[in-house]
């Protein structure tokens, strides 16, 4: 197994597949991602879901061994950053979200183990919030890395207030809230294109993975409130890019990922696929049945869950709120 190189994990915010052109939405909200379908480095996934509809519970599971399907104690679960550190990766956490606040603590704990940290939106929840657009993150991406690096980039993405997320309006229709959300999705697509351009130029680039923490329901103004759960809050994008040399070194991994493009997957399992992609072996606890790049992957629509194990994905089709 090829190990090492530079890998990038981009975490989106509040982006639902329902408003993404690349997933069939009628507006041109994701022109870059749509074009990427022609890029041989790109592997798109159709059926990704959030494990929860709020950032901290969602990312606490996503970035650690803990998931909806195991009975692991969260306090004992390793995080992807801790494991990457031990495996000899230089770790970076670059964020446009605040570091400390009532809601950010477990995610901040994970981020705090990264060797290099850049927080572009201040430290504390009660400090003056800066409405920095996500392009502020671009200059923070290292221009050269050690031989092995894991760069995690946490976007503000499509978080409400949507109008604060992008510089210039693009869409105008009958619903100003939806227009603003679609503008945020379109700007997010631009940001992803710029991140990809930068990291792809790194001499040792191997792969980039993008997923959103959870979705959003702007149409009903429900945002991502778990107590008013609707399926757009759970439907998220997942896409991966792997360099030609990674694909040449790891053809089986690529073949297995491609065979799972239509598979059902929840983002509490990003940890498992990242461990595989990073080439990390010999951990005390591994779950190949939850690894999207494994032949043993066994999550299906029938056994997949969201809202931390309280809602079954199998119920999506019968839900009144599509």
Spans of model-derived segments:
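Short beta-strand segments
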Residues: 93-95, 150-157, 182-185, 207-212, ...
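Marks the mature luminal ectodomains of secretory-pathway proteins
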Residues: 189-193, 197, 241, 271-275, ...
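A short beta-strand-to-alpha-helix junction
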Residues: 71-78, 174-186, 226-234, 247-274, ...
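Active-site-proximal cap/lid insertion segments
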Residues: 100-105, 155-202, 227-237, 244-246, ...
């Amino acid at each position: 197994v090829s190990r090492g190189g530079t890998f990038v994990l981009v975490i989106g915010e509040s982006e639902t597949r329902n408003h993404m052109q690349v997933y069939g939405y009628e507006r041109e909200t994701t022109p870059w991602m749509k074009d990427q379908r022609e890029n041989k480095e790109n592997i798109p996934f159709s059926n990704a879901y959030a494990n929860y509809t709020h950032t901290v519970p969602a990312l606490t599971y996503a970035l650690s061994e803990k998931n909806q399907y195991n009975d692991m104690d969260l306090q004992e679960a390793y995080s992807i950053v801790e494991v990457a550190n031990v495996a000899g990766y230089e770790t970076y956490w670059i964020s446009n979200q605040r570091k400390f606040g009532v809601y950010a603590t477990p995610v901040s704990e994970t981020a705090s183990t990264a060797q290099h940290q850049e927080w572009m939106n201040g430290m504390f929840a009660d400090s003056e919030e800066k409405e920095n657009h996500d392009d502020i993150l671009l200059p923070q991406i290292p221009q050269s890395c050690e031989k092995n690096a894991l760069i995690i980039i946490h976007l503000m993405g499509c978080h409400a207030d949507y109008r604060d997320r992008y510089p210039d309006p693009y869409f105008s229709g009958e619903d100003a809230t939806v227009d603003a959300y679609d503008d945020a999705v379109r700007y997010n697509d631009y940001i992803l294109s710029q991140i990809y351009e930068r990291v792809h130029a790194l001499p040792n680039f191997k792969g980039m993975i993008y997923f959103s923490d959870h979705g959003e329901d702007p149409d009903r103004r429900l945002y991502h409130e778990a107590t008013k759960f609707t399926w757009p809050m759970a439907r998220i994008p997942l896409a991966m890019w792997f360099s030609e040399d990674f694909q040449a070194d790891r053809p089986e991994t690529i073949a297995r990922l491609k065979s799972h493009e239509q598979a059902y997957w929840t983002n509490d399992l990003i940890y498992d696929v990242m461990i595989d992609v990073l080439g990390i072996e010999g951990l005390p606890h591994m779950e190949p049945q939850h690894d999207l790049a494994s032949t043993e992957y066994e999550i299906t629509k029938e056994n997949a869950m969201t809202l931390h194990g309280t809602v079954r994905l199998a119920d999506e089709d019968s839900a009144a709120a599509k």
